[in-house]
């Protein structure tokens, strides 16, 4: 889930990806 790519393997947007990273931080 690296925001540098802008997409997770699940195809989520960068913004959603950042929210996920914060949730698991």
Curated annotation (Swiss-Prot):
Coiled-coil boundaries: none
Keyword Disulfide bond part of the UniProt annotation: yes
pH dependence of activity: Activity decreases below pH 5.5 and above pH 8.0.
UniProt keyword Ribosomal protein, yes or no: no
UniProt keyword terms in alphabetical order: Antimicrobial, Disulfide bond, Fungicide, Plant defense, Toxin
Function as written in the Swiss-Prot or TrEMBL entry: Involved in plant defense. Inhibits spore germination in C.sojina, A.niger (at concentrations >50 ug/ml) and P.herguei but not in F.oxysporum and F.solani. Does not inhibit vegetative mycelial growth. Inhibits growth of C.albicans and K.marxiannus but not P.membranifaciens or C.parapsilosis. Probably acts by affecting the cell membrane. Does not have urease, chitinase, beta-1,3-glucanase or hemagglutination activities. Does not inhibit trypsin. Injection into mice produces toxic effects such as dyspnea, tonic-clonic convulsion and death.
Domain of life: Eukaryota
Subunit structure comment from the entry: Heterodimer of a 27 kDa subunit and a 17 kDa subunit; disulfide-linked.
Transmembrane segments: none
Note, other: On the 2D-gel the determined pI of SBTX is: 8.2, its MW is: 44 kDa.
The name this protein goes by in its record: Soybean toxin 27 kDa chain
GO process annotations (BP): defense response to fungus; killing of cells of another organism
Entry comment describing in which tissues the protein is expressed: Expressed in seeds, leaves, roots and stem (at protein level).
Post-translation changes: SBTX is known to be glycosylated but it is not known which one of its two subunits is modified; contains 5% carbohydrates.
GO molecular-function terms, A-Z: toxin activity
Induction conditions: In seeds, induced by jasmonate.
């Amino acid at each position: 889930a690296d925001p540098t790519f802008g997409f997770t393997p699940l195809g989520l947007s960068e913004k959603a990806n950042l929210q996920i990273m914060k949730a698991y931080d």
